[in-house]
Amino acid sequence: MAEPSVLQKKTEIFLERDIYPLLKNFPASEKFSLCQEIKQSCYKLIRAAVMANNLTNVNRRLMWLDEADAEKTLLLVLLGVAKNQKYICLLYTSP
C-alpha cells in the first residue's frame, strides 16, 4: 500500500477541521440534503485522491485526478450555495 498523498492528507484535514464544524450550523431542514451532498463530495474527493495515489498507470491516474478536480469544483459550488443561503459565512482565520 502506498503512502497517503499530500492531496489525500490535506483533504482529510480539511474535512475534519473545516467542513464538519461548518456543517454543525446548518438548519435541520438542510441536514439531509445540502449538508449530505457536501460531505459526499468530500468523501469522493478523498476516494479519487486515494485511487490516483495507488495506481501506476499514468492514464488511469490522470483520470482519477480529473475526477478529484471535478469534485473540488462541485464542492466549491455547494459551499457557494450554502453561503448564499446564509447557512455559513466563510471567514478564514489562520490557526
Predicted regions and their residues:
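Short Lys/Arg-rich basic patches
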Residues: 1-9, 60
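Amphipathic alpha-helices that form helix-helix packing interfaces
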Residues: 14-15, 19-22, 41, 45, ...
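Helix-loop segments that flank and shape redox-cofactor active sites
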Residues: 17-31, 51-59
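Surface-exposed helix-capping loop/turn segments at secondary-structure junctions
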Residues: 25-29, 81-88
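Membrane-helix exit/interface motif
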Residues: 46-54, 79-83
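Mid-chain, well-packed structural core segment of small domains
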Residues: 61-86
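Conserved small/polar residues in nucleotide/adenosyl-binding loops
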Residues: 92-95
